[in-house]
């Protein structure tokens, strides 16, 4: 999609920051209007992160107007609010390609643009990186400004406070803009959210205005003692050493620009608190920012199937109905993980701990020690953030905690920061853990039940984003730990499948007349099955939707080497690279994990 110059005359002129700075201040409200309208037009067609970007239009315009980007560093925390930033930095005519194969990245990416100072996708990293950049600029004697824009719940994560704790002590020249829209993907939770609500309250805002009117403006900004006492209101940020300013209207472009200009050359760490409306300018998104956080397409070919997240949510409700010891935990992913119904039906058994994966896992440890049965729902890519807690606080103590690992494997359009392809490799080495890989939605249901009933340590069920294959959900039964299923009997070739590629593998097995086994468990492996198959076949193929290095195939390799089984093995999975964006089907095709690709990989390997 190209710019419609008649519809967006000012935006078409300001599609670079150099041109943006040529505009008069009086023209900026119209620019903000056109930028918001363009976002509405483009994202409604191309799909993608929607509401967050609408809420930061004025902030984005003001930052590029006041600061000398790209020399000055803008760091967008998490990054799903950066669509306006991309448009204003020369990528507007490509914005319809965002999240698509070979298109613009879903989030800021250093490889894509010099204006993207930090590649992001996960939350709460901006202040730490920004502090490092600020220190580097000071050491080099360069008058480079560093600004971190953080919001959408990212301030609740421990890493953000670790960085503020450091920045408040050393007083490096750093500006943190708190984009306070009262939301992550879901509603913000926790004591910090309550504290921000107090800061936003009418009473404190009125007090703030009265004090400002009583002070000479020049004196207000020159005398640090007056500044701190007049506007801090004992905010947590001022108590941590930041020079707190706000809260101010994050949609008043004139006010934002004036404030930025006044503090631009000030020394020390500032936190500017701006109150915004997620979904600003589009009433449905303003009224329901959770629904409109992302616009996505549903594949009509699987419209009659349940999503794996729905399977999990339904199972959770069934268990909670008869087991009051179940405690379900999510780190700010209630909607995406299929837990909305559960949270309403069983509020006393549900905890949203906000964006705090490390806390979520050790919180579950405390519950397990106390006799409860925690279920932690977590995305594969975010599980990485709680790795030490899993080892030190759960596995080492042999605590029975079930981890429902959503978005495992190829996730698709969110790209390399969100692909859930490392979990098998980083989980498999943990002693005592049980790892299950369902091949369909009913298997997922049975494995969740099996993991929940397992009482000898942690268990993991990893399942993909998207919809199942239409399998009927059967009554819950425990699966024997470490036991696989033969799905097809063939000759000479045995395909050991781990997870959701089973259907694709079946098509390949038919063409090759191969034996196909649904291994079900990555740990413990069904060693008796492998030994049996090794005596009946000449070739082994392992198949998984995850990285080959250290994954399920590596587990098979280790076993056959130790047992002196002299069979050639082909490991099929994802290579040693970060997986780019595209639909799940596109990525599987690129890496030859669709049925034809699997067949060809095996066929050509056998011919060598």
UniProtKB/Swiss-Prot annotation:
Binds 1 Mg(2+) ion per subunit. Mg(2+) binds at residues 152, 181. Keywords: Isoprene biosynthesis, Magnesium, Metal-binding, Thiamine biosynthesis, Thiamine pyrophosphate, Transferase. Thiamine diphosphate binds at residues 80, 121-123, 153-154, 181, 282, 357. One of its GO terms (molecular function) is magnesium ion binding. Coiled coil: none annotated. SMART domains: Transket_pyr (SM00861). GO terms for biological process: 1-deoxy-D-xylulose 5-phosphate biosynthetic process; isopentenyl diphosphate biosynthetic process, methylerythritol 4-phosphate pathway; terpenoid biosynthetic process; thiamine biosynthetic process. It catalyses: D-glyceraldehyde 3-phosphate + pyruvate + H(+) = 1-deoxy-D-xylulose 5-phosphate + CO2. Belongs to the transketolase family. DXPS subfamily. InterPro entries: Dxylulose-5-P_synthase, THDP-binding, Transketo_C/PFOR_II, Transketolase-like_Pyr-bd, Transketolase_BS, Transketolase_C. Pathway: Metabolic intermediate biosynthesis; 1-deoxy-D-xylulose 5-phosphate biosynthesis; 1-deoxy-D-xylulose 5-phosphate from D-glyceraldehyde 3-phosphate and pyruvate: step 1/1. One of its GO terms (cellular component) is cytosol. Its EC number is 2.2.1.7. SUPFAM superfamilies: Thiamin diphosphate-binding fold (THDP-binding), TK C-terminal domain-like. It is an enzyme of class 2 (transferase). Catalyzes the acyloin condensation reaction between C atoms 2 and 3 of pyruvate and glyceraldehyde 3-phosphate to yield 1-deoxy-D-xylulose-5-phosphate (DXP). This is 1-deoxy-D-xylulose-5-phosphate synthase. PROSITE patterns: TRANSKETOLASE_2. Homodimer. HAMAP family: DXP_synth. Its cofactor is Mg(2+); thiamine diphosphate.
